[in-house]
Regions:
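FAD-binding core/adjacent interface of flavoenzyme oxidoreductases
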Residues: 1-5, 23, 73-140
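Beta1-alpha1 glycine-rich phosphate/pyrophosphate-binding loop at the start
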Residues: 2-60, 64-67, 140-141
Length: 141
């Protein structure tokens, strides 16, 4: 069975894992943390969720679905990737995994301005996504 290592356990990585497992691949998802989605308090604009859901809960559901279908999830940090004639060697902090293919779904880092105390106001006036967060501030001064 062809093997796939997906680096990144956010929405893109988990969606890819679900599709790849259903296509008959042996899939391992490697992720080091919950990323930006895991820090999101309220999601109100995601199709299929009529009630507010947290990013952590959405990730939890996505992981459960991927695992139920057969993907293997590992919380670890990738330290390198090497390619040889036999495929890829993905080096992590807890060992090495081999795969026929590697998919990178590492997301993008949030650009936080270097302003003292800014973190304490995130979600309480400081926002990084106008399209996502504008609704929360409608009608407020």
């Amino acid at each position: 069975m062809p093997t796939l290592v997906i680096i990144g356990g956010g929405p893109a990585g988990l969606s890819a894992a679900i599709y790849a497992v259903r296509a008959g691949l042996d899939v391992q998802v490697l992720y080091k943390d919950d990323g930006a989605l895991g820090k999101t308090d309220k999601i109100e604009n995601y199709f299929g969720f009529p009630d507010v859901i947290s990013g952590a809960e959405l990730l939890s559901r996505g992981r459960a679905q991927a695992e139920r279908l057969g993907a293997q999830l590992h919380r670890t940090e990738v330290t390198g990737i090497e390619y040889a004639d036999t495929g890829f060697a993905v080096k992590t902090t807890d060992g090495e995994r081999h795969a026929d293919a590697v998919l990178l779904a590492t997301g993008s880092p949030r650009a936080v301005p270097d302003i003292t105390g800014i973190r304490e106001f995130e979600g309480r006036g400081v926002s990084y996504c106008a399209v996502c967060d504008a609704f929360f501030y409608r009608g407020k001064d």
